[in-house]
């Protein structure tokens, strides 16, 4: 026996606590640190993380934008930094390669690697979010990279996502979309697909197909949000849950008295010309709507309760109205808005004009219409678009971000990586940071 062992044994004789307490403490620290390491290890944790793990999780899952741009300064409104990013975008987009359908088909051959490489958040971040699942109806037809980035931005394991893929889309796009969805238990392609035509009934039917599938899922979601492939969130999932709870069971969408020029869209019978994929007005006037309220104007994007969605399929009057709308022009721009004012629909708002809601006041979608852009000091609702315009709608640029993140909407439309990918990259970085640092004021 060594001299030190002999001395230690002699000191411990008759002093059991003196010797066992340090050993017990050492054992406790060893086991405790081991479990702490496991709790903060993404490979071992599918549970809600402890607050002490959030920093290490963010380090592993951050989506810092590539290049030299400073997204934090851009989001905070640094006009010089935004200008540099816009100039950088002009140079980068000439040589940037957008991910193809084939790239995603290959990348998803190993789903675990795909989820890790693309930094999906595969665990719930709070009990509040876990107890308030959201359903998504995602209608897409092209640009697989934009769809996948949108999915990653809104993905949580407790939500449920239905993806409607246009039947007219190239086979490679459809395969890529199915490949991506196959990597998640709570993401699926709609059971019935439509050949969507702009301004036709089929655009509404695409959402209805997803709604029906979502009602049949095992997830007891509370609200439904519908999106398209050019949307991107400007709120985290936690922020959306907080806002949805504050609705107190009401829906949120644009719903206003329509301008006169829009009324012909539902006053006349329209036909879809299959050879040209265009909607054509006939001389046949339609019978009045079966609803006991006037027709209201809105848009395709809505935030509605589960009970509202269920009533679309079971309320007799709502079903008659849906049938009545099938031969009209762009029914998505008035059907939801009108049903929202029907007293038998859950979460409705009264039909009186005092309850009219503009797209600015609704939370569903932030859109900049070219005709309304201008100097806000002179009464314009928003500043000019810094990207470009498509169908009179702003395709956002980096310079729009500071204004955008100060709005209350859940999503903004439109985005396109071919127009300004820096805008999307900075939003990705901003949202991921806020997700793991919810109490910080980043903007």
Swiss-Prot record:
Lumenal topological intervals = 34-443
Catalyzed reaction equations: a 3-O-[beta-D-galactosyl-(1->3)-N-acetyl-alpha-D-galactosaminyl]-L-seryl-[protein] + UDP-N-acetyl-alpha-D-glucosamine = 3-O-{beta-D-galactosyl-(1->3)-[N-acetyl-beta-D-glucosaminyl-(1->6)]-N-acetyl-alpha-D-galactosaminyl}-L-seryl-[protein] + UDP + H(+); a 3-O-[beta-D-galactosyl-(1->3)-N-acetyl-alpha-D-galactosaminyl]-L-threonyl-[protein] + UDP-N-acetyl-alpha-D-glucosamine = a 3-O-{beta-D-galactosyl-(1->3)-[N-acetyl-beta-D-glucosaminyl-(1->6)]-N-acetyl-alpha-D-galactosaminyl}-L-threonyl-[protein] + UDP + H(+); a beta-D-Gal-(1->4)-beta-D-GlcNAc-(1->3)-beta-D-Gal-(1->4)-beta-D-GlcNAc derivative + UDP-N-acetyl-alpha-D-glucosamine = a beta-D-Gal-(1->4)-beta-D-GlcNAc-(1->3)-[beta-D-GlcNAc-(1->6)]-beta-D-Gal-(1->4)-N-acetyl-beta-D-glucosaminyl derivative + UDP + H(+); 3-O-[N-acetyl-beta-D-glucosaminyl-(1->3)-N-acetyl-alpha-D-galactosaminyl]-L-seryl-[protein] + UDP-N-acetyl-alpha-D-glucosamine = 3-O-[N-acetyl-beta-D-glucosaminyl-(1->3)-[N-acetyl-beta-D-glucosaminyl-(1->6)]-N-acetyl-alpha-D-galactosaminyl]-L-seryl-[protein] + UDP + H(+)
Q: What class of enzyme is it?
A: transferase
Instruction: Give the GO biological process terms.
Output: protein glycosylation
- Cytoplasmic topological intervals: 1-15
- Per the UniProt annotation, where are the glycans attached? 62, 106
Topology of the protein relative to the lipid bilayer: Single-pass type II membrane protein
Localization per Swiss-Prot or TrEMBL: Golgi apparatus membrane
UniProt GO MF annotations: acetylgalactosaminyl-O-glycosyl-glycoprotein beta-1,6-N-acetylglucosaminyltransferase activity; acetylglucosaminyltransferase activity; beta-1,3-galactosyl-O-glycosyl-glycoprotein beta-1,6-N-acetylglucosaminyltransferase activity; N-acetyllactosaminide beta-1,6-N-acetylglucosaminyltransferase activity
Q: What EC designation does it have?
A: 2.4.1.102, 2.4.1.148, 2.4.1.150
Origin: domain of life: Eukaryota
Keywords of the record: Disulfide bond, Glycoprotein, Glycosyltransferase, Golgi apparatus, Membrane, Signal-anchor, Transferase, Transmembrane, Transmembrane helix
Pathway this chain belongs to: Protein modification; protein glycosylation
Question: Where exactly are the transmembrane stretches of this chain?
Answer: 16-33
Which GO terms of the cellular component aspect does the record hold?
A: Golgi membrane
Disulfide bonding pattern of the chain:
71-228, 162-385, 183-210, 394-426
Q: Which family does it belong to?
A: Belongs to the glycosyltransferase 14 family.
Function, in words: Glycosyltransferase that can synthesize all known mucin beta 6 N-acetylglucosaminides. Mediates core 2 and core 4 O-glycan branching, 2 important steps in mucin-type biosynthesis. Also has I-branching enzyme activity by converting linear into branched poly-N-acetyllactosaminoglycans.
Q: What is this protein called?
A: Beta-1,3-galactosyl-O-glycosyl-glycoprotein beta-1,6-N-acetylglucosaminyltransferase 3
Phylogenetic placement of the source organism: Eukaryota, Metazoa, Chordata, Craniata, Vertebrata
Q: Which gene is transcribed and translated to give this protein?
A: gcnt3
């Amino acid at each position: 026996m060594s001299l030190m062992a002999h001395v230690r044994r002699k000191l411990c004789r008759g002093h059991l606590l003196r010797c066992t307490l340090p050993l017990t403490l050492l054992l406790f620290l060893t086991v405790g640190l081991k479990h702490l390491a496991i709790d903060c290890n993404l490979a071992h944790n599918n549970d809600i993380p402890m607050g002490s793990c959030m920093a290490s999780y963010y380090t592993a899952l951050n989506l810092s934008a590539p290049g030299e741009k400073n997204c934090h300064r851009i989001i905070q409104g640094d006009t010089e930094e935004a200008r540099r990013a816009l100039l950088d975008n002009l140079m980068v987009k000439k040589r940037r390669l957008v991910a193809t359908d084939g790239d995603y088909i290959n990348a998803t051959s190993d789903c675990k690697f795909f989820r890790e490489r693309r930094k999906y958040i595969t665990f719930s971040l709070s009990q509040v979010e876990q107890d308030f699942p959201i359903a998504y109806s995602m209608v897409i037809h092209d640009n697989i990279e934009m769809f996948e980035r949108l999915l990653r931005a809104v993905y949580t394991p407790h939500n449920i996502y239905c993806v409607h893929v246009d039947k007219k889309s190239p086979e490679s796009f459809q395969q890529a979309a199915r490949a991506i969805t196959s990597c998640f238990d709570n993401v699926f392609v709609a059971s019935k697909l439509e050949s969507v035509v702009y301004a036709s009934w089929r655009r509404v039917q695409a959402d209805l197909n997803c709604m029906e599938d979502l009602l049949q899922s095992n997830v007891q979601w509370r609200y439904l949000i519908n999106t398209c492939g050019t949307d991107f969130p400007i709120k985290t999932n936690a922020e959306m849950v907080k806002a949805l709870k504050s609705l107190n069971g009401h829906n949120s969408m644009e719903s206003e008295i329509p301008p006169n020029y829009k009324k012909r869209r539902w006053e006349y019978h329209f036909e879809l010309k299959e050879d040209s994929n265009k909607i054509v007005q006939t001389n046949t006037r339609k019978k009045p709507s079966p609803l006991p309220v006037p027709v209201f104007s809105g848009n395709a994007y809505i935030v509605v309760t589960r009970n509202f969605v269920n009533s679309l399929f079971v309320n007799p009057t709502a079903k008659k109205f849906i049938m009545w709308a099938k031969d009209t022009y762009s029914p998505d721009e008035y059907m939801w808005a009108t049903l929202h004012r029907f007293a038998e629909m859950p979460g409705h708002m009264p039909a009186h004009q005092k309850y009219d809601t503009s797209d600015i006041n609704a939370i569903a979608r932030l859109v900049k219409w070219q005709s309304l852009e201008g100097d806000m000091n002179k009464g314009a609702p928003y500043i000019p678009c810094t990207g470009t315009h498509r169908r009179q709608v702003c395709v956002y640029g980096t310079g729009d971000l500071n204004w955008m993140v100060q709005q209350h909407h859940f999503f903004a439309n439109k985005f396109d990586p071919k127009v300004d990918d820096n805008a999307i990259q900075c939003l990705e970085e901003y949202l991921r940071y806020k997700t793991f640092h919810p109490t910080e004021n980043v903007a």
